Amino acid sequence: MAKGVNQIINNIRLRKLRKILNQINALSEEFSNFSDEALQAKTKEFKVYLNDNKASLNHILPQAYATVREASKRVLGMYPKDVQILGAIAMHQGNIAEMQTGEGKTLTATMPLYLNALTGKGAYLITTNDYLAKRDFLEMKPLYEWLGLSVSLGFVDIPEYEYAENEKYELYHHDIVYTTNGRLGFDYLIDNLADDIRAKFLPKLNFAIIDEVDSIILDAAQTPLVISGAPRVQSNLFHIVKTFVETLEKDKDFIVNFNKKEVWLTDEGSEKASHYFKVNSIYQQQYFDLVRMIHLSLRAKYLFKYNLDYFIFDGEIVLIDRITGRMLPGTKLQSGLHQAIEALENVEISQDMSVMATITFQNLFKQFDEFSGMTGTGKLGEKEFFDLYSKVVIEIPTHSPIERDDRPDRVFANGDKKNDAILKTVIGIHETQQPVLLITRTAEAAEYFSAELFKRDIPNNLLIAQNVAKEAQMIAEAGQLSAVTVATSMAGRGTDIKLSKEVHDIGGLAVIINEHMDNSRVDRQLRGRSGRQGDPGYSQIFVSLDDDLVKRWSNSNLAENKNLQTMDASKLESSALFKKRVKSIVNKAQRVSEETAMKNREMANEFEKSISVQRDKIYAERNHILEASDFDDFNFEQLARDVFTKDVKNLDLSSERALVNYIYENLSFVFDEDVSNINMQNDEEIIQFLIQQFTQQFNNRLEVAADSYLKLRFIQKSILKAIDSEWIEQVDNLQQLKASVNNRQNGQRNVIFEYHKVALETYEYMSEDIKRKMVRNLCLSILAFDKDGDMVIHFP
């Protein structure tokens, strides 16, 4: 019923898009008769029209799309099909376009990118990795340049590349920019740490199309981008605590909730810890760090799996994205968790760094005036797209009917029997020369199947996070005659698998999946590697009762039935009742997994709200300071009065010694005035005296700065230094606070309310501390000039 209603709604949306498509098609013959020069001149015509008439882009959409369509035929030899035009219209309108694998999303995106770039405000194509961004940029660059638009790759594809001055500015200030979500996110954070307007390089974020949008803003929504700062004081407890944790008994000394990714000590475990570390109670305030370390070690040991969440490369822990199967180089878990895993695996423990700046992908893309996206699996996430981003998913029909045969699951009582059946199936397919792609949940399983196939003289390519460098080549070869490719779920997205004619004739690509993934979108994405653009092919998932999905998310005890384990596998597999029960168990487990993941993303979004509001305020204030041409209207005396009024109220400045010490610490390193004539019982008199000292010291610094530009830079840097030092500390505190409340049992308190309450309190304290540091910086900084005559500021 619901499916039928959704289809009706989708058809209504498509009907509206088709009206615009008809307008574009009506222009096709006219535009095909244009000379190259006339077609190229359209770009300038559109820009002039938009500027002179203050018209919306919708007014010129039909002509603009007709222009790109015709230009694409002439420059690239590709003429966008009607279904691609529908997807392009949907994305310009800010929707998510669901387009199946092989339907030409790269070409589809050129139309809304071109249209939105005509405003002069820029447009971005954002994808998941460097390879795809560079590939799409190189393929589409000739089209944009032929039409008179500038286009760039938003990064230099050289490892450890150091950008020259203004190089990033030049990369980003093009009409169209191709980049990745990770690179844009880090650049956004770096740009907002600039202490000079000339060091900023990002333009205002106008319009973006996100490729594989569900992967980026749903699946990766909880992953914060973090810029690290100074190292924290390194704890020497990691190895000691690891040894203690190995003595604990699960369910007796500690409880693990795998689904919520929580772990906590029981009363017995707490007593055992107190005895082990020879303290009265580990919950005394002075042992807070010990308790934190115990929780970190438990999480590392029981919530993170080798070859699923991380692997070891060159003596370092490298994280893996569970959903995509891709490695996350340069990314570290925060708040000591990364170091706990390092201790667990006996590799060198790295420095735990403080957090300077952080943002989630959810909030990064909310910085754009508008964004849309495209994916092959959007409909299954439609509710979440709407709830989090107010985005509608429109299912775009395929150009050719999908010929892929998605076969029913094959079911087994246990993993050993299932694995034997998978190997027999792959060998059987290989004997027909039909190519096969075997996809596994973990790298460990992929390595197992690859090795077993080699033992049986079946050559195969192994694609896991550790050898991602060969990904494009392996995927390109996966559709060739007799090819066998074993891969993790990282094979589910990216480069298309193209079939040779011989392969097309013998049934296309066979996709074998060794178990259902945690969400049905990933299952569908993996199946979609076969059957692109009407190609033949088939997919099949193999299931057992001890699959990770079933063990983690199902409360069924069917797997414990001893009779099942001893029954003949072929008889069991042919049992309609058994298949029905297993299908029900798997479907329910996957549904619970999806609902839990959604709740976790909602929780992460709730946590992010406080820091998001605070970050927006801080960044807006920083930009206001950076863009100021003077500070004539800034009331420095009121700033000083606010600080001194609070300090006189909260600090004991009623003695001459206390007042003089306060001046030394906040206003002047050299002070020899007589304060005996000040009435120490009169707060206003003390405040007035402090304001006089502030004004004198501040003016002294301005005199050293000499000209108006240097005075401006001194004030800007003094204020920014105060903001940044306090904001960095606030961000780091909020990260640790979030980790702290996540370790507590949710049933005992409303952790979200608790987090926001503390976050607001600390923000208010931070705001006062910023003012105090501004006063200190304006009065105590030492200004000097280097041999080139450039001003150097030494802050207190």
From Swiss-Prot:
The keyword Thylakoid does not apply. GO terms for molecular function: ATP binding; protein-exporting ATPase activity. It is a peripheral membrane protein. GO terms for biological process: intracellular protein transmembrane transport; protein import; protein targeting; protein transport by the Sec complex. One of its GO terms (cellular component) is cell envelope Sec protein transport complex. It is found in: Cell membrane; Cytoplasm. It catalyses: ATP + H2O + cellular proteinSide 1 = ADP + phosphate + cellular proteinSide 2. Keywords: ATP-binding, Cell membrane, Cytoplasm, Membrane, Nucleotide-binding, Protein transport, Translocase, Translocation, Transport. The keyword RNA-binding does not apply. Its EC number is 7.4.2.8. It is an enzyme of class 7 (translocase). ATP binds at Q84, G102, E103, G104, K105, T106, D496. CDD domains: DEXDc_SecA, SF2_C_secA. Belongs to the SecA family. Monomer and homodimer. Part of the essential Sec protein translocation apparatus which comprises SecA, SecYEG and auxiliary proteins SecDF. Other proteins may also be involved. Part of the Sec protein translocase complex. Interacts with the SecYEG preprotein conducting channel. Has a central role in coupling the hydrolysis of ATP to the transfer of proteins into and across the cell membrane, serving as an ATP-driven molecular motor driving the stepwise translocation of polypeptide chains across the membrane. This is Protein translocase subunit SecA 2. It comes from Staphylococcus epidermidis (strain ATCC 35984 / DSM 28319 / BCRC 17069 / CCUG 31568 / BM 3577 / RP62A). The lineage of its organism: Bacteria, Bacillati, Bacillota, Bacilli, Bacillales. The gene is secA2.
